[in-house]
Amino acid sequence: MADFWLSNKQALDIPLIGRQAFKVFFCFAFAYFISYSFRSVNAVLSPELVNDLEISSGELGLLSSSYLIGFGLAQIPVGILLDKYGPRITEISLMIFAVVGALLFYSADNFALLFAGRMLIGVGVSSCLMSALSGFRSWYPIDKQPQLTSAMLIFGTSGALFASAPVRIILPYIGWRGVFLSLAMICAASIVILYFFLPVKTPKEKPTIWISNSNKVKLLSWESYRPILTNPNYLRLLPVGAISLGGFIALQTLWLGPWLINVMHYTSEKSSQLIFWFNAVLLITYLINTFFLPRLQLIGVSTFSFLSWMTGISLVAQGAAFFLHGPLNIFWWGLYAITSASFVLAQSLVITSFPISHSGRVSTTYNVSIFIGASLMQWGIGYFIDKGIEWGLAVPEAFTLSMGLYLIIQALGFTWLILAPKFLPQFYDSENVKSKL
């Protein structure tokens, strides 16, 4: 059994095609489905959690952020583990923490245990997408990377759909504790699937990181991460991950529900239905992108150009959603879902800027920025809602104030995305950089 765990008896034909390619993709996709379910479920459970725990908006944001904190803290170790041991051992080992965290959350009777349980869940699912991206970079053609990334998000968004209306339907029967017990059981099933069906990384020479003078350095050192953190493409795409995608995660997984209830005055049931349709639009957009992106490339439209346009349009959609509270408000949220589906493409652009041997560290380093941003946005939105109320604003106006501040931050990040070569031309004058973006 140990030999099966650590060695690779069956050689893979690279790149993967056909049945083997689909099988490997499904293993990653099912795990990511569970990850997204854990991430999104608080948007539906928040009224029950608030009632049971009597917590404020800021405290609710902190509880939800505990998932993101655990997720973010695990990213650097995940990158090292992925490059050293491969996706299979890394993802299985970590998902055990998710099962333990879900069981702790299920049985918790105080805020501290809830916080600890949700943080463990964040640690446990922290490699679900990154393991997939690392595996894709190693086992699939490079021109398929954006398409595979979008396909993964189809399954992730399916998890968000599962965590919205379906959870609302079963909630009266099993309660929020039963929801987490069920997720723990599904997560355990995913571990079994990963164990038996994912390829095993062949043991190789102890991995080292490339730097310009070709010296070998320790994996966990500044010299190991300097080429990543100072890479022009990484820096240019950083705001898309930390601000745009991070903020989207904060809205999708927590604040969209309270917005619909407190600003648009929908019931909890109606809010859950609208969150379901928001995620359905997102899923359909990911599906369209999976087939649409390769065709755009054929006519000369780069992934970076597509990402830039969608990021800009998303600002318009959010501005309308935040400030126009009429009957068309849900339309603007739908447009935001459509445009935000492109944010994840920044990850594939960053990863393909580096050699395959670095894919684990590159993907997780960028993911750290995403989840630091998501944690700050999730907490910050709640903080300024509470502050707005303290300053004498009504609850709907406090929500609008907080969302408006978030929109301004996004606009600054978008400005950097577009004008970075003008701000720092010395970073963007090489053909290597131009060819990537």
Task: Mark where each language-model region is.
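Helix-to-loop junctions at the C-terminal end of transmembrane segments
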Residues: 76-86, 286-301
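Paired small-residue
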Residues: 97, 101, 112-120, 328-335
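Extracytoplasmic
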Residues: 23-57, 252-257, 377-378
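Juxtamembrane intracellular "pre-TM" segments in multi-pass secondary transporters
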Residues: 8-17, 202-238, 436-437
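Conserved MFS/SLC helix-loop-helix module at the cytosolic interface between two early adjacent transmembrane helices
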Residues: 73-112
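Extracytoplasmic gate region of multi-pass secondary transporters
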Residues: 42-43, 232-289, 374-382
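Cytoplasmic helix-loop-helix junction between adjacent transmembrane helices
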Residues: 117-155
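Helix-loop-helix hairpin linking two adjacent transmembrane segments in secondary transporters
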Residues: 151-203
